[in-house]
Amino acid sequence: MGTDGDRAKAVDLAISQIERQFGKGSIMRLGAKERIEDIAVIPTGALSLDIALGIGGVPRGRIIEIFGPESGGKTTLALHIIAEAQKRNGLAAFIDAEHALDVSYARKIGVNTDDLLISQPDTGEQALEIAETLVRSGALDILVVDSVAALVPKAEIEGEMGDAQMGLQARLMSQALRKLTGSISKSNTTVIFINQLRMKIGVFFGNPETTTGGNALKFYASMRLDIRKSGSIKSGQDVIGMRTKVKVVKNKVAPPFRETEFDILFGEGISKAGDILDLAAESGIVEKSGAWYSYGGERIGQGRDNTRNFLKEHPDILVRIEEQVRSEHGLKPRLQEQEEPAK
């Protein structure tokens, strides 16, 4: 072996060769802080998650998988990403294979439902054909499929209730993703698959949880987000929301395995004010002394809930704090980000 300098040069040369051949972000140092500047993103609606993803949101022209237990916030997060894309004049589509989209809740989150393309397909094949046609059009910015578990193959629907249909859904997903992946990259469309968890039978060691639809989606996804409830948010005796934990279990464009937590309030979605308050307190932008929170030398609230409500009622202060948090974490200012075109 050569000297440390020779080895470092050899590694740098190998990295540059890999990046030329396979693209920027195909290899990186795990502790690297730098953002991959040329990756266009759509914010998630939760600033802490944008930071955890390493690039300020979900990347365009990639496949994303959001999975977790029931009522964990999967669809809520996907709807927030749609709302953020629409704020940037993006066109969004929602393939509702579960036939369960709550339109009034989507509106409360900020989705422009009048411009949202929606499809409620009868079979898995139909859902994925519609997805491919929309992606190939090149006009779409974001497509959400809710959910992989509800993409039932035609043969299973037409068969008898007790028929064994082994591996049909996995084969369907594998074939569809092979066709979709090239179109997604060319059209710069972000495709989000929402997925459910199942328990593997007979697993005594390791994690018994697995996602539906076989292994293809695990391989094709550039990001995989594990989202689940970590606690309840109460106002007196009433439960008004839930604390949600997201773990980035796969990330091809930034270092993976980062985690974050934020509040989801019922009927409102992700609490932007609560999320920014937590980040600001963590980095010292908002000072916390006992139960009191202070900003710019002035007290803004006693207790987290009161301070969160104060920030909701004073959006000008919230925007100032958000810009400081974004600057602290190397993200673009929000105004500059919103001025950029959708495509």
Curated annotation (Swiss-Prot):
The keyword ATP-binding applies. Keywords: ATP-binding, Cytoplasm, DNA damage, DNA recombination, DNA repair, DNA-binding, Nucleotide-binding, SOS response. It comes from the Bacteria. Pfam families: RecA, RecA_C. The keyword DNA repair applies. SUPFAM superfamilies: P-loop containing nucleoside triphosphate hydrolases, RecA protein, C-terminal domain. PROSITE patterns: RECA_1 (PS00321), RECA_2 (PS50162), RECA_3 (PS50163). One of its GO terms (molecular function) is ATP-dependent DNA damage sensor activity. It is found in: Cytoplasm. Belongs to the RecA family. PANTHER family: MITOCHONDRIAL DNA REPAIR PROTEIN RECA HOMOLOG-RELATED (PTHR45900:SF1), RECA (PTHR45900). Can catalyze the hydrolysis of ATP in the presence of single-stranded DNA, the ATP-dependent uptake of single-stranded DNA by duplex DNA, and the ATP-dependent hybridization of homologous single-stranded DNAs. It interacts with LexA causing its activation and leading to its autocatalytic cleavage. This is Protein RecA. It comes from Syntrophus aciditrophicus (strain SB). The gene is recA.
